[in-house]
A protein has these predicted regions:
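A conserved beta-strand-loop-helix scaffold within acyl/acetyltransferase catalytic domains
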Residues: 2, 6-82, 87-93, 134-149, ...
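Active-site/acyl-donor-binding loops of N-acyltransferases
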Residues: 2-26, 136-164, 297, 301-365, ...
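Hydrophobic beta-strand segments of well-ordered beta-sheets in folded domains
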Residues: 16-20, 96-100, 117-129
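Short, high-confidence coil segments that cap the C-terminus of an alpha-helix
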Residues: 68-70, 120-124, 242, 296-299
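Non-catalytic accessory segments adjacent to catalytic cores
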Residues: 107-156
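Aromatic (often tryptophan-rich) hydrophobic motifs at membrane interfaces
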Residues: 110-116, 224-337
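PEST-like intrinsically disordered, low-complexity C-terminal regions enriched in Ser/Thr/Pro
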Residues: 366-379
Length: 390
């Protein structure tokens, strides 16, 4: 029985049996895709949040970056929505806008099947910052890991979370928490949903937390650049779905957090403390209390995003590798693009070397590798710029 992908609204149909990605005896044949051009339907918006719980897969956020609606691909399996991807096409390159979620190979193959069947001039599909259920053996593709997103699966209760923490972590949290309350008995932690706070208060809180973050990083010899446009986007999302954690002493803010609710997940956008209280590990305490607040709200998971910090693993967050993925129309089309293959390979080796350098002490070999990385980076950047101009 032929499976169809397409939309009755746009008349886009493609027989899956004519596309080389599908085999009659596997799960791919049971996935029916729908392409809706130049719009994101309401049920797709809900599906993005329900399926992925990621800020960078959420249309409410993506439209702040680019208000022009992209194309939407929606996948169904046995009448259940199993995938939603937003994408744009430019000069034969399909760029997927949906990011920071786990991409299953079957969903990737179904998407490639439908897109390559519908858009005959499309040569490649590019995903940025997606987790992959490796290995990808079905597709003609290249991929490499370049970052990570720390994700914490949340239990049903704060008590269960406390019991799951390591003995040393529980001791640290209890010890510093008791010391903070002993030295500052007026300390109070509470959470507020954004709907209970005026906009000007939300804005003041975000700016104060950013200043705490900047001061803390400066104290460690690092620089933080705060982008005004990104802050505006953050404030708009905070007003829509934010939860603030507030720590105060005698009514003055000394620590806090901002998490955004996407589907049944939270994304921790800010968590910072006044560096004057660094002796109490107040930053760690604030993150822990914020995670407890997410549990109280019934969240399924919390994204702590990128950045390798020990406290994330102390609080049981697990790193999920983020990949850049390029899918080619076929292995033959892939072989016809040697420069593109070389560029992806060079960028992949560059990231592997960077990961190695992070785990090794400075050495002569390290300096040599850094020099090679500089060459690889220039090569990749030059080719990417040329390909964008075509």
């Amino acid at each position: 029985m032929a499976q169809y992908s397409g939309s009755s609204l746009t008349g886009l149909e493609s027989r899956a049996e004519h596309v080389p990605f599908a085999r009659a005896d596997d799960s791919l044949a049971s996935i029916v895709g729908q392409i809706v051009e130049h719009q994101v339907p309401p049920h797709a918006i809900d599906g993005l949040e329900r399926l992925y719980g990621s800020l960078y897969a959420c249309w409410r956020f993506l439209r702040l970056c680019d208000p022009v609606p992209p194309h939407t691909w929606i996948a169904y399996q046995r009448d259940h929505m199993v995938g939603v991807l937003l994408f744009r096409i430019n000069a034969g390159l399909v760029r997927v806008q949906t990011e920071m979620f786990i991409l299953d190979e079957t969903i990737a193959a179904a998407f490639a099947r439908d897109v390559f069947s519908r858009y005959r001039d499309a040569s490649d599909i590019e995903f940025n910052a997606v987790g992959l259920t490796l290995p990808f053996t079905r597709l003609a593709c290249q991929y490499f890991a370049f970052s990570e997103n720390y994700v914490l699966a949340l239990p049903d209760s704060v008590e269960s979370y406390q019991q799951a923490l390591g003995k040393s972590t529980r001791k640290t949290l209890r010890g510093y928490g008791n010391r903070l309350l002993r030295d500052h008995p007026s300390f109070e932690w509470r959470y507020c949903l954004s709907e209970t706070l005026p906009r000007h208060v939300q804005r003041a809180l975000v700016h104060q937390l950013q200043e705490f973050k900047r001061a803390s990083m400066t104290a460690r010899g690092k620089q933080v650049k705060i982008d005004a446009h990104e802050t505006t986007q953050l404030l708009r999302m905070a007003a829509d779905c934010g939860m603030f954690g507030l720590g105060s002493i005698r009514g003055k803010l000394c620590a806090g957090s901002l998490a955004l609710k996407i589907g049944d997940s939270y994304v921790m956008m800010l968590c910072a403390a006044d560096p004057a209280f660094s002796g109490y590990r107040l930053g760690l305490l604030a993150c822990y209390w914020s995670l407890c607040d997410c549990i109280k709200q019934g969240a399924r998971q919390c994204h702590l995003l990128w950045g390798r910090y020990r406290y994330k693993e102390q609080l049981l967050a697990v790193p999920v590798s983020l990949h850049r993925l390029r899918i080619y129309r076929s292995r033959w089309h892939m072989l016809l693009r040697p420069m593109r293959i070389a560029c992806m390979t060079a960028r992949g080796w560059s990231q592997r070397c960077r990961a190695w350098l992070r785990s090794e002490s400075p050495s002569r070999q390290g300096r040599i590798v850094r020099g090679c990385l500089s060459v690889l980076k220039r090569f990749g950047s030059t080719y990417h710029a040329i390909s964008m101009q075509k």
